[in-house]
C-alpha cells in the first residue's frame, strides 16, 4: 500500500482541507471537554501546513447523534487556538453557504475549523470511496480546495465521506499523526524485529481474541501475555477451575461461547501465556491465589505472573501493550499493569501502547522517549489494524496515490 505523506506532496500557498480527529470525552453534567490530548496531537500537522503558506480548513466529528457527547466544536476551536498559539476561526456550519463563503474569503496562512461533520447526515453512511466522492459534502467542498490531508488515524476504520470521499477528487496525503501511527504499527509486521511480545488485557474479549487469532495465523507473535478477561477466558479454555464467581463474570460479559476458539488456539501450540496466579479481594483484603485455586472474583494478575511476563519483556525487540492486567480503577489492582508498563519502558525494545486505560497510566511515569515509545491515538482503528482488517481511510489514500496524483 502506497500512502503519500506531506513530504511527497509539497502543499504550499494553497487551501487545504485537513480531516483530523478531535473527538474527545465530554463531561455529561457540564458539557466541557475532559481531555485535549487528541487536539494537541494534530498541532504538528497544522503548524507545518500553515508554515508553508497554506490556508488550513479543519474538519472533524464529535460523538454520534443521540449520545451525550454529540456537540458542536466551538470549545474544540478554543483549545486548538491555545495549543497552536494562533487564531482559529470557528465556523458554525459544515458545507452550507456560510461555510463556503468563509472558506472562499479566508487568507492563506490562517486556520478555520468547520463544525461537527456528523451534523451532516451523509457522514453517518458507510459506503465506498467512489460513492462518497459523489456525495453532496464532497461535491460542495471539493472545488474550494487544492489538496486534502487525512490526519485522523483514530477514525481510519470508518468508510465515511470526510474520510474516503475527498482522496478520489483531490491530491491527498496522510498527515503527521497518520504517518507516525502507520510507521509505528508497521514494525509489528516487519521481519527481523523479533522477538515480538504482545500484552493483551482489558475487558474487550472478542476484540482481543480476534487480534490473537490474526497474530497466530500470521506468525507475528513470539509471546502473547494475557491479563484481564481474556486471560480468564484462556484459563477456562485450558481447563483451570476459576470457580463459579468468575464463570459468572465471563457469562455476564457474554464471552463463554468463545472458549472453543481459545481452546483451539491453545491446542495449536499458539504462544499464549496464561497467568499462574491472580489477585482477589475477600473481606476488604487483597490476596494472591494460584490460578488453579481461585476462591473469589479475579481483580488482577499476581506477582509471580508479573515476574514471568517481565522476563519475556526484557528480551523483546517489539512490545505491544493493549489493555490493563486488572481493575485499574481501584488503586490496589493497578500495580501489575504499572510494573509491566515500567519494565517495557526500561527494556531495549520499541514499545507501542494503545487503549485509554494504559495511556492514562503513562501520565504518572514521566517523559517518554519518542524514539522508543509510540502512544497510539487509535481505538477501533488500532484494534482492526492489529487484527489484520482493512482500514478504508488508508485504502482511499492509496487509491489517490495511484489514480489522482498520476493525472
UniProtKB/Swiss-Prot annotation:
One of its GO terms (molecular function) is ATP binding. Substrate binds at residues 21-23, 38, 61-64, 118, 158. SUPFAM superfamilies: Phosphoglycerate kinase. Its EC number is 2.7.2.3. It catalyses: (2R)-3-phosphoglycerate + ATP = (2R)-3-phospho-glyceroyl phosphate + ADP. Gene3D superfamilies: Phosphoglycerate kinase, N-terminal domain (3.40.50.1260). Its main location: cytoplasm. Pathway: Carbohydrate degradation; glycolysis; pyruvate from D-glyceraldehyde 3-phosphate: step 2/5. Disulfide bonds: none annotated. Monomer. This is Phosphoglycerate kinase. It comes from Metallosphaera sedula (strain ATCC 51363 / DSM 5348 / JCM 9185 / NBRC 15509 / TH2).
